Amino acid sequence: MQSIFGTDGIRGRFNEEITYSLAYKVGYALGSNLENNNPILIGRDTRISGDILLHAITKGINASGKKFINLGICPTPAIPFLIKQEQLSSGIMISASHNPPEYNGIKIFDHNGQKITKNFENKIQKFIEESNQNISVTTKEISLKANKELMDIYMKSLIQSMGGENLSGMKIILDTCYGSATTCAKKIFQSLGADVRVLNNSKNGLKINVNCGSTNLEPLKKALRQSPADMGFSFDGDSDRVIGLDSKGNVLDGDHILFLWGRELMEQKILTNNLLISTQMANLGFEEAWNKIGGLLYRTDVGDKYVHDAIKEKRAVLGGEQSGHILSKINNFSGDGILTALQISKYCKKKNITLNNWLKTSFEPFPQKLTNINLNFNINKVNQKTRILINQTTENFQKIYSDNCRIYIRPSGTEPLMRVLVEAKSHKKVDSLSSEIANKLILEINKIMN
């Protein structure tokens, strides 16, 4: 049996890679392998399939003899926060993050609120394989009433992260993209005194991430043009990432957030070794500007778990990804889009500066283009020999095209895509190289597959 775990838990199209049966088995395997008898916390985003998978997982947990608490629809970061806060044994988030509505996923957290280790993933996998014939889906009905009190505790923690600061006098637009942020983002910002307008704020599992949210900023840009505000924030489906816009529609991505937030911590002398952690996707303009003010940038592979591991290893206090996953010491390094948006808003209010003017003090990004090459297969599911050949091909391309530019090629961890990042000092060079590399790379991959 091929590994059910990818780069960020289990993810795939519902009723294809992610099924009721698999979800039941994961719940059963997790419950059976936990020594701690405290309840397992479960949450989900708004996807239609989320309710079906919730039923399956909870029945599996129940069959294993363990108890669970249903948090209902919630941001992913609520799960790790509450696991630690309430001393629970583990947690599961049912979500496919920024992926389209037809996808779903299962993220598992340990008793410390950290994503489970590779070793524990292997343990779950082995248990499912060995118990495959013995697991039967029970018909016993169990209560799935959502625990609103725990959700209130999470929301209060975000308000408390402001350290007594408020957002009165600030006009802010939020795009909650029909996802998890619909449960609490508006309420939190309003409770802090902000004048809030919210887009796509209904729980709609058919529209989650569709032409909205952190991967499509057009609705937020349009709203800022039609109804001026100080800033806007766009979340993804499970609210663990955020992208901002200033009053003029300029983009505040994860690189800008790290630079501005990191510089504040540096000035307060609480940024360990002036070090930030980011990934291979981080813009070279960001790195050069950060180095110029005395900072260090350590790059990891793409994925917040790699950033998290490097933060722990290097004893850093801040890290993240260009995509808007920001991990800070405030909440034990769990990516939280709402927390990040609050911190950026707080600094603007405290410094008495507009986001537009603050953003101008950061850096000028190098032209950068990310091209998605559609494959008719998921590279993570091909045999090892084929995967090695494809990896060797991408490494060769990165070496061949490394003069006067930066190339980074990687497969998507969740979709049948190869992502090609090209970065150079001119848009013309970026465009021509992106097209050339994408065309040649797909030919080479097709040769390997045929």
UniProtKB/Swiss-Prot annotation:
Biological processes per GO annotation: carbohydrate metabolic process; peptidoglycan biosynthetic process; UDP-N-acetylglucosamine biosynthetic process
Free-text remark on how the cofactor is bound: Binds 1 Mg(2+) ion per subunit.
CDD domains in the record: GlmM
UniProt-listed Pfam families: PGM_PMM_I, PGM_PMM_II, PGM_PMM_III, PGM_PMM_IV
PTM notes: Activated by phosphorylation.
Catalytic residue list: 97 (phosphoserine intermediate)
UniProt entry keywords in alphabetical sequence: Isomerase, Magnesium, Metal-binding, Phosphoprotein
GO MF annotations in UniProt: magnesium ion binding; phosphoglucosamine mutase activity; phosphomannomutase activity
InterPro entries (UniProt xref): A-D-PHexomutase_a/b/a-I, A-D-PHexomutase_a/b/a-I/II/III, A-D-PHexomutase_a/b/a-II, A-D-PHexomutase_a/b/a-III, A-D-PHexomutase_C, A-D-PHexomutase_C_sf, A-D-PHexomutase_CS, Alpha-D-phosphohexomutase_SF
Residues binding Mg(2+), per UniProt: 97, 236, 238, 240
EC number: 5.4.2.10
Cofactor field: Mg(2+)
Modification sites for Phosphoserine: 97
Magnesium found in the keyword field: yes
Protein origin, superkingdom: Bacteria
Catalytic reactions of this protein: alpha-D-glucosamine 1-phosphate = D-glucosamine 6-phosphate
GO cellular component: cytosol
Family: Belongs to the phosphohexose mutase family.
Record function comment: Catalyzes the conversion of glucosamine-6-phosphate to glucosamine-1-phosphate.
UniProt-listed PANTHER family: PHOSPHOGLUCOMUTASE (ALPHA-D-GLUCOSE-1,6-BISPHOSPHATE-DEPENDENT), PHOSPHOHEXOSE MUTASE
Protein known as: Phosphoglucosamine mutase
Gene source species: Prochlorococcus marinus (strain MIT 9312)
